[in-house]
């Protein structure tokens, strides 16, 4: 492996922006990480791409991702495109011997995700690494929650209760951006944000969902066609188009450890901007986390006397907690962007040490299988559907 890791990033939208920040900052705060060279950024619009290159700090820009993957001076390919291109780009990069980190969800369906996982496992035989970018695993408070559960503080797990609530498309005149097109995005709130809480439930408990009963709902059937894109949104142009994905997804789930779960993901929860929350209840206690208070974890110890019962707040800002020592003194909080720096750090250290990064493409495939099962259930009157 070269002393420095030379990175190519495909895509320069919202995720491209935050990934660029992570690549740019990782060496400043994690000195044991390999040195990163932000070599080339790739996208379709030459003018917008060049602006992104300058703004985000990349050395070069290129409009043809196939040329990027063919280059000998690229070690890592970071896939930040829409879901419909993940399979082709990631598999091509892995076959070319490039390490790959790919945004979530891994693909638009389980068939595509299966092909990606197979390619990743084959590439791993040559120490070529791959990881799916579920950044919430890198929130220090959730990492602490995982430690609590693994140490037995919660006892036998009975319930997982997870929500991801947003309101950014509640305006019926919000444009028909690519996230509202099934061909491009695969699904709506289900794949975009429910994927996060499905992965979080697995990350925390170590248990997988085996069956689901779900409902999907699209509240706004038509929207103005989009104009030029800016981050998550876009301007509007003449005409209207059909929304082909869900606005909200709700499902119950059975886990392989005997626990039961409830999951809700919506972009229509007025007043909720990015309220990703998860609660786990066990025989000895409970944890609760809400990303809108991302530096805090609530913990209830049910082994205490009832006169002392109740949730207590744990500040995840102490240097002894995962990732925190790299940043600021205790009590100085971190934010959303730091979780991406943490995942980039873990990924490049796995390359350096020849270890297996997590979550793997197999983990991403598992999440995609759950998403597909929810869609299948919703299309069959919420019939209980096995995750296969």
List where the protein language model places each region.
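Terminal low-complexity tails and localization/encapsulation signals of metabolic enzymes
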Residues: 1-8, 14, 324-333, 346-350, ...
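N-terminal Rossmann-like dinucleotide-binding module
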Residues: 1-56
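Glycine- and charged-residue-rich phosphate/anionic-cofactor binding loop of Rossmann-like
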Residues: 35-39, 350-367
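Conserved SAM-binding strand-loop segment of SAM-dependent methyltransferases
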Residues: 59-64
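Beta-strand-loop-alpha-helix segment that lines the small-molecule cofactor/substrate pocket
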Residues: 75-76, 82-137, 152
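Glycine-centered short loops/turns at secondary-structure junctions
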Residues: 97, 127, 152, 258, ...
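Predominantly a Rossmann-like dinucleotide-binding segment in NAD(P)-dependent oxidoreductases
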Residues: 126-128, 136-242, 297, 381
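C-terminal glycine/acidic-rich active-site capping loop/insertion
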Residues: 217, 221-246, 250, 254-257, ...
């Amino acid at each position: 492996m070269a002393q420095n890791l030379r990175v190519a990033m495909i895509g320069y939208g919202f995720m491209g922006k935050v990934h660029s920040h992570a690549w740019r900052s990782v060496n400043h705060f994690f000195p044991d990480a390999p040195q990163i060279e932000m070599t080339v950024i790739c996208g379709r619009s030459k003018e917008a791409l060049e602006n992104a290159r300058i703004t985000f700090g990349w050395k070069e820009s290129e409009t043809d991702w196939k040329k990027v993957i063919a280059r000998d001076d690229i070690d890592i390919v970071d896939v930040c495109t829409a879901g419909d291109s993940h399979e082709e780009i990631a598999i091509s990069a892995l076959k070319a011997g490039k390490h790959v980190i790919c945004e979530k969800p891994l693909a638009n369906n389980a068939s595509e995700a299966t092909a990606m996982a197979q390619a990743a496992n084959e590439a791993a035989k040559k120490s070529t690494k791959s990881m799916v970018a579920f950044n919430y695993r890198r929130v220090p408070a959730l990492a602490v929650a995982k430690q609590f559960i693994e140490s037995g503080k919660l006892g036998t797990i009975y319930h997982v209760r997870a929500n991801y609530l947003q309101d950014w498309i509640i305006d019926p005149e919000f444009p028909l951006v690519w996230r509202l097109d099934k061909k491009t995005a695969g699904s709506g709130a289900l794949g975009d944000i429910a994927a996060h809480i499905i992965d979080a439930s697995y990350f925390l408990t170590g248990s997988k969902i085996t069956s689901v009963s779900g409902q999907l709902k699209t509240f706004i059937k038509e929207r103005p066609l989009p104009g030029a894109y800016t981050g998550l949104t876009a301007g509007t142009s003449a005409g209207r188009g059909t929304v082909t994905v869900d606005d909200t997804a709700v499902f119950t789930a059975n886990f392989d450890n005997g626990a039961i779960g409830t999951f809700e993901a919506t972009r229509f929860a007025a007043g909720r901007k990015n309220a990703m929350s998860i609660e786990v209840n066990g025989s000895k206690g409970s944890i609760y986390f809400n990303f809108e208070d991302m530096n805090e974890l609530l913990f209830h110890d049910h082994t205490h006397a009832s006169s002392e019962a109740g949730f207590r707040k744990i500040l995840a800002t102490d240097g002894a907690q995962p990732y925190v020592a790299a940043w600021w003194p205790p009590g100085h909080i971190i934010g959303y962007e730091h979780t991406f720096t943490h995942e980039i750090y873990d990924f490049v250290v796995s390359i350096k040490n020849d270890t297996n990064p997590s979550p793997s493409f197999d983990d991403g495939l598992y999440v995609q299988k759950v998403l597909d099962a929810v869609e299948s259930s919703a299309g069959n009157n919420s019939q209980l559907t096995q995750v296969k």
